[in-house]
Amino acid sequence: SKKQITLLFTAADRADGADAIISTLKKQGIKGAFFFTGEFYELYPDVVQRLLKEGHYVGSHSYGHLLYSPWGNRDSLLVTREEFEKDLLKSYEVMRKAGIEFKDAPLYIPPYEYYNRQIAAWAKNMGIQVVNFTAGTASNADYTTPDMKNYRSSQAIYDKILSVEAAEGLNGHLMLIHFGTDARRTDKFYKGHLERLIKVLKNKGYKFVPLREAVGI
């Protein structure tokens, strides 16, 4: 795979990273991919419009941020097919109100980035393709708060990403950053660390490409 990276952002009900992330991507000439819940579309219509105006991909992260499978038992389901489809269609209805047509947003990141083959098959049947971030860099730990066992500081995440790059490269990586995080986390990755990381990776010869180009859809 080529020396290219795609930045993904997900959010359920927080948008505190909006200004920092939008301006960083604009400054660096990068088109990101953003996945929001129905609640997010209803709470932050102005943020959604700003992202669309900048030419970013804006898609679904479900309507109600449902947990599809129990933690630790990915093969079983907590939702019926009907519940799954109803929730997802509802999210596309909310998106349509924001001016996002179904054909503009065929790629979907499930809630909690947690799903199984059955969910992917149900989505595919609706003409929707599930995507997920590339695991291993710990970029997605940027939501953790200091009281958590799995807490990682922004510097620790930054260092981990670069150590993975040094060891095996980040070719074709879909890197997940959270669009907003808990107020208890004052050390926000999107403030400073994200831009530093982008600059370092560009210097190493990486190109940041839009999601649809990366997955070819």
Language-model segments: residues:
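Catalytic domains of cell-wall/extracellular-matrix polysaccharide-remodeling enzymes
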Residues: 42-43, 67-176, 180-202, 206-207, ...
